[in-house]
Curated annotation (Swiss-Prot):
Glycosites: 213, 291, 304, 337, 1133, 1147
Name of this protein: Sodium channel protein type 4 subunit alpha B
GO terms of molecular function: voltage-gated sodium channel activity
Bias-annotated ranges (Acidic residues): 875-892, 917-928
Amino acid sequence: MARLLPPTGTDVFRPLTLESLAEIDRRMAEEAAEQERMKEQNVKVAEEDLPKPTSDLEAGKVLPFIYGDPPPNLLNVPIEELDPYYKAQKTFIVIDKKNTIYRFNTEPACYCLSPFNPVRRAAIRILIHSLFSLVIMLTILTNCVFMAMSDPPGWSKILEYVFTGIYTFEAMVKVLSRGFCIGDFTFLRDPWNWLDFMVISMAYLTEFVDLGNISALRTFRVLRALKTITVIPGLKTIVGALIQSVKKLADVMILTVFCLSVFALIGLQLFMGNLRQKCVLWPPVGWYSDNLTVLSNYTDINGNGTANSTFDYQKYINSEENYYYVPGQMDPLVCGNSSDAGLCPEGYICLKAGRNPNYGYTSYDNFGWAFLALFRLMTQDFWENLFQLTLRAAGKTYMIFFVVIIFLGSFYLINLILAVVAMAYAEQNEATAAEAKEKEEEYAKIMEQLKKQAEQKNGMVNGSKTSLSSKKKGDNDQMQSDYDGIALKPLSKSNGSKGNINYLEVPDSQIRKPSVVSAVESALDAQEDIERPCPPGWYKFADIFLKWDCCIPWVKFKRIVYLFVMDPFVDLGITLCIVLNTVFMAMEHYPMSVHVEEVLAIGNLVFTGIFAAEMVLKLIALDPYYYFQVGWNIFDSIIVTMSLVELMLADVEGLSVLRSFRLMRVFKLAKSWPTLNMLIKIIGNSVGALGNLTLVLAIIVFIFAVVGMQLFGKSYTDSVCKISSDCELPRWHMADFFHAFLIIFRVLCGEWIETMWDCMEVAGQGMCIIVFMMVMVIGNLVVLNLFLALLLSSFSGDNLSASDDDGENNLQIAISRITRGIDWIKAFVNKHVRQCLNLKPKEEGAKVNGEGDAKMNAIMNSSSSMVKVPIANGESDDDDGNGSSEDEDDEGRDINMKKKNGDESSTCSTVDKPPEVEDLVEEEEEDLTSPEDCYTENCIRRCPCLDLDVSQGKGKAWWNFRKTCFAIVEHSYFETFIIFMILLSSGALAFEDIYIEQRRMIKIILEYADQVFTYVFVVEMLLKWVAYGFKVYFTNAWCWLDFLIVDVSLISLTANILGYSELGAIKSLRTLRALRPLRALSRFEGMRVVVVNALVGAIPSIFNVLLVCLIFWLIFSIMGVNLFAGKFYYCFNETSEEVFDHNVVNNKTDCYELMEFHPEVRWMNGKINFDNVGMGYLALLQVATFKGWMDIMYSAVDSRAIESQPVYEANLYMYIYFVIFIIFGSFFTLNLFIGVIIDNFNQQKAKLGGTDIFMTEEQKKYYNAMKKLGSKKPQKPIPRPTNCCQGLVFDFVTQQFFDIFIMVMICLNMVTMMVETDDQSAEIEEILFYINFAFIILFTGECVLKITALRYHYFSIGWNIFDFVVVILSILGIGLADLIEKYFVSPTLFRVIRLARIGRVLRLIRGAKGIRTLLFALMMSLPALFNIGLLLFLIMFIFSIFGMSNFAYVKKEVGIDDMMNFETFGNSIICMFMITTSAGWDGLLAPILNSPPDCDPDVDNPGSTTRGNCGNAAVGIVFFCSYIVMSFLVVVNMYIAIILENFNVATEESSDPLCEDDFEMFYETWEKFDPTASQFIDYNRLSEFCDTLKDPLRIPKPNTLKLITMDIPMVTGDKIHCLDLLLALTGEVLGGSDQMDGMKATMEEKFMANNPSKASYEPITSTLKRKQEEVAASTIQRAYRSHILKRCVKQASYMYRDKTGSKKPTGEAPEKVGMIAENMRSLYGDQAVEDDHPVGCSFSQHGKTQFGAKRPPVKVQSDVVLHSAPFPVPESSTAADNLRESIV
């Protein structure tokens, strides 16, 4: 805290002097000495304790206000450091006029310019001047404009030199002021300056050195656009976030590339060469022999059998004239030779010839092209084309391949990228918010500190000051008084979250005032300034001219106007006018009669008048001053002004754009429509946050557009004939900047492959792939996902609360008034009618019921409930808890719910929430043990005969009958039977295709089956009626569904019996049988969970967003109608299939003249057009899903005037309309669906207490098992064989190295497979065969070795069985390759399967943790994804059946052909699967939109009684739009929600210090120490075990003390249990915490459940206790020994004196009896001294020799002498095992 307090006094800012430099040197020397001292003393400082720079004093930040203003003479000159961190570093700062801090190095710049050098000072002044950066910015922008010119003027070369000169000058200034690269804060130490350096170097390099390809090098100039990032401050941070997210994407990228490689290999093996199969015209007669045997050398054979080589077979089949082309297609028709592949027309044969489709770039012929195809499939770009080509060439069964890749690659991996980007963004947001909060607290503390200082300084005078400032604070709660009484706005919530920290930006002039009075004045001034941001003159002007309070009559008039114009009814009227105006605008269409046009024009005038009047009245009522303070009023005034301007300029040509401003009126609805308001807010918030991101995106788009133009522009113009038949530039090219920009924008929309093919064809493959991939990855995957992440974050929390004003809006008040009025009239009429009819008896009842009801209704209907009801705990008025934060209340609410269970809810409460559907279902399932009442109480009251006595007679019989029915219905067999019947009846629908008429037998069977199913379902329904009663049956949503479907079947069955089956109405009713599979929903728990919990819950919010999207799109649709209605028509020649040139036919009149003489000429309209708002919506849906949007855009861009022939790119800038719509209509609104679903998903989760809502109980168990595998128990390791050779093999194969070696071999095997190509030579094929053979031998060897070593245990491991099967299949594959390939799939596929083994090796690589997390997230998502997949299949099934019954006979053109159609169930499913990702639906819809003369309603369909090949346009549009909304927007987005959720969970899991792999590793190590799997190891092996573990659980040696302190429980026999040890080690890693205790408990429980044996081994001690016992014992021992020793010495001394007689001992001997006395006696005995020199240890003491006693016996010596002295402390070298137990 103290570090932020500036030094008090006036000397905060000190100029830099020579003394300052000396001081810095002194401090540096001190610091170096201190570090040296710490190094010597081995003192380590934790990283977080190291000093850090103060964030507020970083270079580029504004000086904190706390420092006050620097004196003017110290601005723009070097001054001493303010940041304590840099005090001991060679730096100084410079502060400019705006108080921005710049930091420089004190070392001489370029070795010669010291900080005092005038040149350097001048450079510094220039560098920090605001004009300098402005000039540079303008230079960059001007340079960008010139770079974007495709054909710059001649003098631009001179400008180029000027730009280079300015950049050089900038760099020179930076180098002179900062120094070049040595030391901190020099020029090259800032990575952004590297960019400048490169740009300038390249400019000089290309100028003076001839480097060949100049255009490629000139593209480096584009990097100058990046310099904008260095100049605009906010951009650096967003680029930082982008770089962060790219770093985080590394793992996803690796996983994606790996998966794509695997899929590409599979594609390579399955489809290599297939796409070259084409329909070739049968060769001329006579090229083959009579018996049709083709000779191998393909020579022509004449009639008599002699070979004739004039016919060149290769040339014939490679000639493009001999191929079959579908009209309008560039490539020949692809075909296949399998039974379910595409067939050729009559007279053609399917052969492999020529090149691949799309210039030869779409193929699986080698790994590179296969990888590109799979990447395209994963990004879903034009994948329907690849899908159709592959199915046509290989067969429909291969749809499975695409299903797997779309679900795994496209839905999973691409969304993982979104998840990672969203997480990176969220993390950054949190960090910013946390930093802001921290600063806020810090500054609050500083304020306190300064306040205290000020108080101490000012003494008693302070009293008056504080009272004044506190009074001020009382007046305005928004203010905080600081230390000088200066009012400061606290950080608002929004500011905090966005990181705009404004609390530093208080006018600095008011800081550190000398006197108290002036301090108070300054506080008041500051307050005024904050409230009134404009100069004072403005306020005087406003008071005079903008506040109209001139005289009393006027004021009274104003008040009347105010009462009128602010009345809720007027608001209601205006809202209705807005709606009506919108309807009027939406009524415009083409062709429109003059009368309608007049009505609409008058309507527009009326509405404009109404809105203008409203504005004028509000201006009068509120005064302009207050009127323009409200955002909505400003919005209104702009629109009204624009409308009036438009009316004035109505006749001016080209200003029709002003008409579109009227459309903005629709947004006024947001005032009273919370969801629309919320959406606009979210877009507003996002646009705020997206400001910088949009700039970055714009820079990226600009750079790539210029790069494309510079690199490929010339190639497009030179090689245009390769991609265009008429050698004219196509629509998508890079020859000029605008078209290059459009191509880059198209790539950002996800459509890159088609433009890339063109680029590769004209400019070569390498460069195009690099540029397009960079745009795709950087632009589309990263930046656009960041957009989405921002949108999702806008959804969170605050923004979702309803409108700002918590009160209700005027509209609700008006409506509640109306409803109350109606209720009052009803009651009044009712009362008078009863009086007239003299209904006396019911009068009181009428009073009670009539008025009571009316009142009650009024209460119920008025949105603000008048009645205040005490609500029981656990209830709430609305879902979001009245705007109170849910987080706080959730827990309490849960507890209350559990306690009360709803018992205390107030009976009369009008706000009780009705139980939700799911609750009802649950209750019925659980509570019904016997039948309930058949009828409701009201029914029984009305018809008393229904109330039977069930205790006797008929009533009892009826009750028993009901109970029997109930038992039947509730029986599990009954349910299973019904499910079986539902599946059968649904399956039967799939057979009713176009061939049913030809299969009479199947048709008859189906008719009878249909009757049977109907009877079964009717019986089921009747049984349920009897069993459950009507009340229960008809209050259950699922039963209603059953009821309606059974009704449909009954009606169609009855019609068949009566012979009305061909009636149109009955036919359309029969199509509703397609809904039958829906009944399966209620029966399959998995799907019901998804549908009820997730979908039904989301429907209101999805519907809301859908409505808002429709309103949003309505604006664009009406605008489209204004711009393009009637302009999409063209004159067309049906014979040549060409559009006439505008020089031949200019307009409709010319075309009709031609038509008189040429019947093949037609004046046609585009099928998708903007002739009315409805068609406009359809067109916009195609644009938003990027399907069919090209044709719409081409028509728009070519359009001229109504009924005029289109001209190529006549209206080029209409592209901008579509660009704007794509940004707002597609990026924003479609992504809102994801936002809403995720948000709803989280709300549902919160309701259910955080459990996963997409899973059943069973699946949750699986999920939890996946989440924590901590309950593993030790396994018995495979015993090592006793045989010596086997033992060696065993040691070899169980090495980790062996595993990794095999993995490397698998990868090498894959690499050799990648080398395969379709057109490889025979030698390469042979080499590859032998390499593969070698690998098979190697893997077989591995298999044999493992079986030898592991014996029968080999087959107890799943992976080994997998390896074994692959090896067997590989061996078989070599021998029976041809046979397997003929009947099954290519045997090489088995090799690809081996790649699955790489999953095993991930565990061994610590670096692969991120990838393991991603795979873990996938595993966790599987159960929920399976349920959603089921639901998706159900929707696909229903729509397929529906499509078959409606569109089976549609004319085959555009997207419908012999493979893609609705003729059979299989084909329908393929089509529906394709549309799931919204791919190709425009092509399928186009033929359905046909009407005569484009189709023939009377044409015969062979083999069927149905006539005609026209579709029903209305049904088609509803069919496709509803399917796209359901599957593409809802179900697929649920996938995204789940993946985001599980990715977050998995990331949390993996960020835990311990993961599953660590537990696995623990148990693997345990197996080696506990071969019998007894779950125990000896205490003496504990140290070695802990050392053997891997991090983070490892405790390296020496670890004895550490293990002792860990207090690990021990059982009898000095053994330690694995769980106890694991818990102790886990505690060591996680640190002691509550979390740890919880974990211990759960692990104990899990382990107990798995291993009941542990209970019998109760711990009796622990490592710590054992040590404490040992220490205690040795301490007692030592004390006792010391005591004994003392007594021994005493006794010895006594006896010595006694024996030697040196001095007669006085008194008795200390020890007469006992051990010491006996031992002493045996030591000395009773004899006299035998000689003068007794044996013993003699030693010199004070120069005299002391004589020892006679040598004692050995036993006594050891017992007394050795045991009675404390041992010396052993040396550290002593081995632990040799230590005596008495050593401590």
